[in-house]
Amino acid sequence: MDELIIAGKSFKSRLILGTSRYPNPQVMMEALEASGTEMVTVAIRRMDLKSDSAENIMKFLDDKKYFLLPNTAGCYTAKEAVLTAELAREALGTNWIKLEVLGDDETLFPDIPELLKAAETLLEKDFVVLPYTNDDPITCKKLSDMGCAAVMPLGAPIGSGMGIRNPYNLQIIREQIDIPLIVDAGVGTASDVAVAFELGVDGVLLNTAVAQAKHPVQMATAIKHAALAGRMAVNAGRIPKKLYATASSPTDDMIEIDG
């Protein structure tokens, strides 16, 4: 599979995995390995960076093997998100940030005015910003024009497992922006990953679909193959959809059969 390039950095895998809600750290590590991912996202506000306890997933993640992408999960204002990003940069030594600014704790949809405000501030502070946003082409174009390194529209609400609910918006976004387009949230199973790539997205970020699967490692393996299949399919070029049938066998020089 061709490489995913974000802000000049190359990744052989086009999958990004989250690190929360796994049964235990061992299952998490096995699932990450099975998925083939090279980038994992960690929620800065939900971990004790100074702790050496078993609950601190940072002690299990090899930063030489995985590119750590901190996120601002749990932030509801631009101010909270900016402060969290600065904490992540200080603690992890990275200026990359997956920017999340939520509107409420029920839908977990992004608060777009606060998101745009936070993105602008972080870009001024020399962060590499990857914003979680809704599947609105206008918002994604604004984020792209501001200088974000990628846009990450939701496929469906976070953790819903509903899959790609609005493929047409994703196609419009794909046509309107030149930076990487990464589906973030809503993926439920391997077929959702394949569909996303067939729509032309550059990457897929998922967490719950793997972490909460009955067999997380097996699901991680499935999404790895789904990503490969979806990306290969879109590069291969599918046939156009048509209302009427077209015979797959040629009709020229057919043997005449007397009735």
From Swiss-Prot:
Q: From the Swiss-Prot or TrEMBL record, what is one GO molecular function term? A: thiazole synthase activity
How it assembles, according to the record, is: Homotetramer. Forms heterodimers with either ThiH or ThiS.
The similarity comment for this entry is: Belongs to the ThiG family.
Lineage, top-rank taxon, reads Bacteria
Pathway per its UniProt entry is: Cofactor biosynthesis; thiamine diphosphate biosynthesis
Q: Which UniProt keywords apply?
A: Cytoplasm, Schiff base, Thiamine biosynthesis, Transferase
Q: One Pfam family name from the record?
A: ThiG
Biological process terms in GO annotation: thiamine diphosphate biosynthetic process
Which gene holds the coding sequence for this protein? thiG
Entry's localization field: Cytoplasm
Q: Which organism is it from?
A: Chloroherpeton thalassium (strain ATCC 35110 / GB-78)
Where, by residue number, does 1-deoxy-D-xylulose 5-phosphate bind?
A: 159, 185-186, 207-208
| Catalysed reactions listed for this entry | [ThiS sulfur-carrier protein]-C-terminal-Gly-aminoethanethioate + 2-iminoacetate + 1-deoxy-D-xylulose 5-phosphate = [ThiS sulfur-carrier protein]-C-terminal Gly-Gly + 2-[(2R,5Z)-2-carboxy-4-methylthiazol-5(2H)-ylidene]ethyl phosphate + 2 H2O + H(+)
Database matches in InterPro entries = Aldolase_TIM, Thiazole_synthase_ThiG, ThiG
Q: What does this protein do?
A: Catalyzes the rearrangement of 1-deoxy-D-xylulose 5-phosphate (DXP) to produce the thiazole phosphate moiety of thiamine. Sulfur is provided by the thiocarboxylate moiety of the carrier protein ThiS. In vitro, sulfur can be provided by H(2)S.
HAMAP family (alphabetical): ThiG
| Active-site positions on this chain | 98 (schiff-base intermediate with dxp)
Query: So what EC number does this one have?
Result: 2.8.1.10
**Protein name in the entry:** Thiazole synthase
Give an example GO cellular component term for this record: cytoplasm
EC category name: transferase
